[in-house]
């Protein structure tokens, strides 16, 4: 099986390193890493269209896996890999392991999730993998990678719709402390943001943003609630943002709107 690894934390980040090491050690997969050359978290699904992209082959210590560093976004990395860099499209794209969770409305900002969605747009099955809390030690990422590697063969036994990615959040705890696996929907996760104004040497203002996450909607079937219970959350996510519940009501506007076009 050909697997493309990517992320939004950068090609040298500990999460993607751990995932590569664990999957390479298993010897069952043909791996390629194409990832941003630097931190690209919270870049969403942006792509680069107003300048050229640069890609450089890199080598990983004690590894035979091909690596390509790209000066673009996570979505750029997947597009470039699939459409230009690889001889054959991958059978699967894995995005992560992200440093920190991607829960609820995080998925709208997440470069990790967006890379998986870009793969899905190209007809390739994809999984986004994130740590349930921010991790700082390589051992934490290796533990999460080993947990995911146990799950992957079982996941692949059950093909999922091609308009859908799987968004997986793994609690940052030892395997024996994980309480189970929950199939979840997205919760609502917002942030209380603070913008700190500073001055540059020319006296011009610039702003640093920081924020604290707030889980507004924590139904027991949400990803946020599952992670709080120390469960692995698996959420099917797709890019159709249509509000189907509101479609019929919106259709009642048509005559009035057409009337506005006909008058005056």
From Swiss-Prot:
Cofactor: a divalent metal cation
SUPFAM superfamilies with a match to the protein in the record: SurE-like
Family: Belongs to the SurE nucleotidase family.
Keyword line: Cytoplasm, Hydrolase, Metal-binding, Nucleotide-binding
Any Pfam family: SurE
Annotated binding of a divalent metal cation, by residue: 8-9, 41, 98
Record bears the keyword Cytoplasm: yes
GO cellular component, one term: cytoplasm
Subcellular localization(s) per the UniProt record: Cytoplasm
HAMAP family: SurE
Domain of life: Bacteria
The keyword Nucleotide-binding is assigned to this record: yes
EC top class named in words: hydrolase
Catalysed reaction, written as an equation: a ribonucleoside 5'-phosphate + H2O = a ribonucleoside + phosphate
PANTHER family hit by this protein: 5'-NUCLEOTIDASE SURE, 5'_3'-NUCLEOTIDASE SURE
Known EC number: 3.1.3.5
Record note on cofactor: Binds 1 divalent metal cation per subunit.
Protein known as: 5'-nucleotidase SurE
InterPro entries: SurE, SurE-like_Pase/nucleotidase, SurE-like_sf
NCBIfam families in the cross-refs: PRK00346.1-4, PRK00346.2-2, surE
GO terms assigned for molecular function: 3'-nucleotidase activity; 5'-nucleotidase activity; exopolyphosphatase activity; metal ion binding; nucleotide binding
Role noted for this protein: Nucleotidase that shows phosphatase activity on nucleoside 5'-monophosphates.
